[in-house]
């Protein structure tokens, strides 16, 4: 019988998953008396990293083309600062600011994509310039001040809990508590599903794989 060889990409994924569960198991052993073994602890990892999940899902598409984008973190910081300052200092409405930062992100990506695809500048150089620009604009907008968002829409969304009908436990007061998710996790899961379907079932998704494999062949 022929032995099946493990693909290097699958091996890296397997190692990552194993390390994750090893660290989680270590946390369960060390902090067992502090409720670390509860299912909610695992869900908190998703809750705390929902934004990062959305970003990495988009970055996956970039990496599949063989490119790189190091401006993402600075762009997110700039958009968040515009949102916070716009609500607390400029007095703009939340829906308008949400549309504004989405538009800024789209325009930012189009400009960088144009420089990379048509001007044929290396992605690392273009996105590094974008990173410094976004980081500088963030400092200019915030003026070295911290803005705490107190808008009702955001406070409601951030405090809203989606209770799960399993994994409950009794707290110190003897009240049954069930694990929960936040809205951000649902959004992250929708983003992952949308990108998966796009990559697997659309012409654009197949083009991304083709460009990453061989750009000249994909052009033909």
Put a short name on every predicted segment.
Residues 1-56, 90-96, 173-176:
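Membrane-interfacial amphipathic/re-entrant helices at transmembrane-helix boundaries
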Residues 7, 123-202:
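Transmembrane helix-bundle core of multi-pass membrane transporters
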Residues 10-18, 45, 53, 74-78, ...:
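Hydrophobic alpha-helical transmembrane segments
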Residues 24-29, 38-90, 114-121, 217:
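Single transmembrane alpha-helix segments in multi-pass membrane proteins
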Residues 28-36, 89-92, 117-121, 143-151, ...:
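Transmembrane helix-loop junctions in multipass membrane proteins, especially transporters and channels
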Residues 41, 194-220:
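Membrane-helix/interface signature in polytopic inner-membrane proteins
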Residues 50, 54-58, 78-82, 104-111, ...:
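Membrane-embedded alpha-helical core segments of multi-pass
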Residues 91-132:
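Alpha-helical transmembrane segments within multi-pass membrane transporters and channels
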């Amino acid at each position: 019988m022929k032995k099946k060889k493990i693909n290097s990409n699958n091996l890296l994924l397997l190692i990552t998953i194993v390390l994750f569960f090893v660290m989680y198991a270590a946390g369960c052993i060390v902090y067992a008396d502090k409720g670390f073994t509860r299912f909610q602890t695992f869900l908190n990892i998703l809750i705390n990293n929902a934004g990062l999940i959305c970003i990495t899902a988009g970055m996956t598409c970039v990496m599949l083309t063989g490119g790189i984008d190091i401006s993402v973190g600075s762009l997110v910081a700039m958009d968040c600062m515009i949102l916070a300052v716009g609500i607390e200092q400029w007095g703009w409405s939340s829906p308008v600011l949400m549309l504004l930062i989405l538009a800024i992100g789209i325009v930012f990506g189009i400009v960088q994509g144009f420089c990379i695809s048509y001007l044929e500048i290396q992605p690392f150089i273009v996105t590094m310039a974008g990173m410094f620009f976004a980081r500088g604009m963030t400092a200019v907008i915030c003026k070295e001040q911290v803005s705490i968002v107190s808008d009702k829409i955001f406070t409601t969304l951030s405090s809203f809990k989606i209770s799960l009908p399993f994994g409950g436990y009794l707290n110190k007061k003897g009240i049954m508590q069930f694990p929960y998710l936040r809205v951000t996790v649902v959004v992250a899961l929708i983003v992952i599903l949308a990108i998966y379907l796009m990559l697997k079932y659309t012409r654009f998704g197949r083009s991304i794989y083709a460009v990453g494999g061989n750009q000249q062949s994909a052009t033909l």
